[in-house]
C-alpha cells in the first residue's frame, strides 16, 4: 500500500485495482510544484510498501524525505525513468532545467512499465494481474496517441497557447509548438 503523486495514480489504480490500496499524497486541486508533504504524509510513507513519484524534478522534496525515512523495505520508483527529458524548460521562478511534465504525452504515459514492475515485485502473488493491467493501459495510451495524431494532423496551425508551459512533450509528439502567454 503506497502513497503516490497524482500523475502516477492512473496506472497503479488500473494495475492494482482491487489487489492493493493506492493513495494520492497530493490532494486534488493543489499545485504539485509547490506542495510539501506533511508529517502525516511522511508517517504514511514509513508504513507504505511502494512509493511512486513522477520525477524529472517535479517533486523537489523527494530526495530529502526519502533520505529521512527508516522504512528500508519501501520500494521506490520514479515514473519518468526511461523517458528522454526535454531540456530548456523554464519554471515559474525562471529556473531552467528538464521539463517535468513527461506524462502529458500519451506515448510517455505508456512507458510506465517501471511502475508495473515495482507492483509485481512488491506483490509477487498478483504479478500476472499487474502485468495484464499494465498491458491494457499501454494499449489505451497507444490508442490515445493515435487519436491525437490523427485529429491534429489535418490542422494547418498546430500552435498551442497555454497559461502554463506544460505541454512540450505533447507538442513534440504532435510536431506543434507551445508557448506560455
PLM features: residue spans?
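Extracytoplasmic metal-acquisition and chelation regions
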Residues: 1-181
